[in-house]
Amino acid sequence: MPPVVVLIGPPGAGKSTVGRALASRLAVSFEDTDDVIEQRAGKRIAEIFLTDGEAAFRQLEKAVVADRLAAHTGVLALGGGAILDDDTRALLADHTVIYLEVEFSEAVRRVGLNRDRPLLLGNPRAQLRALMDARRPLYEQTATHTVGTTGRTPDEVADEIAALITVREENR
């Protein structure tokens, strides 16, 4: 049985926080593929980027996402860049995928720009803006639903997603 729902979105969208709240509401488990990657690699994502490079990280991410899409039955949050891979996007076509959309200023506030985020090195504000702009079309193309998170609590967002899932299941 596949995940109940898959959450995608940029850093700061609330994938992990909303995912935990949603899993609690649905009485299912929650997994974040970034956590699974770190467990399997035995090191933090930032360290993987520094020691092995982004290409090696993306290969590991692709394998973990494919595995968890096949095996996890709860709420699954993907890392922000997972949708960059064509094969991953193809796998997601068979799932309920929620794009957690967030305004840039809110993402900056949530991420903090001083955190352990390897793709935001250098000028973090400019890097985050470029990353969000480049990935937005892929998030929109991949998602079955888009839910805004700006100015909302994780509980409000989780409630909206739970309602969407219920309606979707009733219409199947």
UniProtKB/Swiss-Prot annotation:
Q: Which residues bind ATP?
A: 12-17, 117, 152
Coiled-coil spans are: none
Q: Does the keyword Isomerase apply?
A: no
| Reactions listed under catalytic activity | shikimate + ATP = 3-phosphoshikimate + ADP + H(+)
Single GO term (MF): magnesium ion binding
Q: Which protein is depicted?
A: Shikimate kinase
- Extract one GO cellular component term from the record: cytosol
Q: Which organism is it from?
A: Acidothermus cellulolyticus (strain ATCC 43068 / DSM 8971 / 11B)
Enzyme class comes to transferase
- Gene3D superfamilies associated with the record: P-loop containing nucleotide triphosphate hydrolases
A Pfam cross-reference name: SKI
Q: Assign the protein's first listed, main location to one coarse class.
A: cytoplasm
Q: Which gene is annotated as encoding this protein in its UniProt record?
A: aroK
Q: Which family does this protein fall into? A: Belongs to the shikimate kinase family.
- Which cofactors, if any, are listed as required? Mg(2+)
UniProt pathway annotation: Metabolic intermediate biosynthesis; chorismate biosynthesis; chorismate from D-erythrose 4-phosphate and phosphoenolpyruvate: step 5/7
Provide the protein's localization: Cytoplasm
> What residues does Mg(2+) bind to?
16
Xref: PANTHER family:
SHIKIMATE KINASE, SHIKIMATE KINASE 1, CHLOROPLASTIC
Q: Which lineage? A: Bacteria, Bacillati, Actinomycetota, Actinomycetes, Acidothermales
Instruction: Please give a single GO biological process term from the UniProt record.
Output: chorismate biosynthetic process
Q: Which domain of life is it from?
A: Bacteria
Briefly state the protein's biological role.
Answer: Catalyzes the specific phosphorylation of the 3-hydroxyl group of shikimic acid using ATP as a cosubstrate.
Q: How does it assemble?
A: Monomer.
Q: Which UniProt keywords apply?
A: Amino-acid biosynthesis, Aromatic amino acid biosynthesis, ATP-binding, Cytoplasm, Kinase, Magnesium, Metal-binding, Nucleotide-binding, Transferase
